[in-house]
Swiss-Prot record:
Designated name of the protein: Phosphoadenosine 5'-phosphosulfate reductase
PANTHER family registered for this protein in UniProt: PHOSPHOADENOSINE PHOSPHOSULFATE REDUCTASE (PTHR46509:SF1)
Lineage: Bacteria, Pseudomonadati, Pseudomonadota, Gammaproteobacteria, Vibrionales
NCBIfam families (alphabetical): cysH, PAPS_reductase, PRK02090.1
InterPro entries reported for this sequence: PAPS/APS_Rdtase (IPR004511), PAPS_reduct_dom (IPR002500), PAPS_reductase_CysH (IPR011800), Rossmann-like_a/b/a_fold (IPR014729)
Superkingdom as given in the UniProt entry: Bacteria
Coiled-coil stretches noted in the UniProt entry, renumbered to this chain: none
UniProt-listed Pfam families: PAPS_reduct
Catalytic-site annotation from UniProt: 242
Family membership: Belongs to the PAPS reductase family. CysH subfamily.
SUPFAM superfamilies linked to this entry: Adenine nucleotide alpha hydrolases-like
Length: 253
């Protein structure tokens, strides 16, 4: 990258979101010209702090897990376990952890799933507000804790623009919740994902064969039906994001 250094987190955190975006424009323009593999190498070499990859071990999770561990084999892989994942997901986690020798770090809410139900009822049945509270407790807070405890400065994720409208304009590099957020496959299509998995002999999530396009918790994931898009298969179509990939100024339950 011609005579340009990446701004420090300290500098970027003094700016508002618009200023951060502008400050990172030239960096992102450069990153758009690189392959995903080149972006990973660039990110590991140029972005400060400890690095980590978050994974939900969803339908296409093997792509990012393979892409990152091929370059940095011991990178921490953070999973936020709600206690309500599909049995097939837990089996998929075990399979990929063994196969790729993952440095898996599992984080969960301080209160168990059963205790939460006793205390709050089934939050996912309580409309958008209930779903957001559920996600805050089971996904956002555990991920925040992981970033803090592992002292993460750069967070890698496998989000892709094609997945939803809320992700359609995301840049490769941004700042989220005080750390660098880096999305190496943000511009990949489903076709590119398919061929990467095929070329590297990597599996889709087991539920892919049963018609699932996206997999999260058992109670908020639907199998794809004709006429549905991917966004409508999660959270009863009420929302797409679980909150994990959104900026939060504060954390509360």
């Amino acid at each position: 990258m011609p005579n340009r250094t990446v701004p420090t987190l300290e500098e970027l955190l003094t700016l508002n979101k618009v200023q951060q975006t502008l400050r990172l424009t030239e960096v992102n323009q450069h990153l758009e010209s690189l392959t995903a593999q080149e972006r990973v190498v660039w990110g590991l070499e140029n972005l400060q702090g400890n690095h980590a990859l978050s994974s939900s071990f969803g339908i296409q999770a093997a792509v990012m897990l393979h892409l990152l561990t091929s370059v940095k084999s011991d990178i921490p892989v953070v999973l936020t376990d709600t206690g309500y994942l599909f049995p097939e997901t837990y089996q998929f986690i075990d399979e990929l952890t063994e196969r790729l020798n993952l440095n898996l770090k599992v984080y969960s809410a301080p209160v168990s799933a059963a205790w939460q139900e006793a205390r709050y009822g089934k939050l996912w049945e309580q409309g958008v507000e209930g779903i957001e509270r559920y996600n805050q407790i089971n996904k956002v807070e555990p991920m925040r804790r992981a970033l803090d405890e592992l002292n993460i400065g750069t967070w890698f994720s496998g989000l892709r623009r094609e997945q939803s409208q809320s992700r359609a304009s995301l840049p490769i590099l941004s700042v989220q919740n005080g750390v660098f957020k880096f999305l190496p496959v943000i511009d990949w299509t489903n076709k590119e994902v398919h061929y990467y998995l095929k070329d590297n002999d990597l599996p889709y999530h087991p539920l892919w064969e049963q018609g699932y396009l996206s997999v999260g918790d058992t109670h908020t994931t639907q199998k794809w039906q004709p006429g549905m898009n991917e966004e409508q298969t999660r959270f009863f179509g009420l929302k797409r994001e679980c909150g994990l990939h959104e900026d939060h100024n504060d954390t509360h339950q």
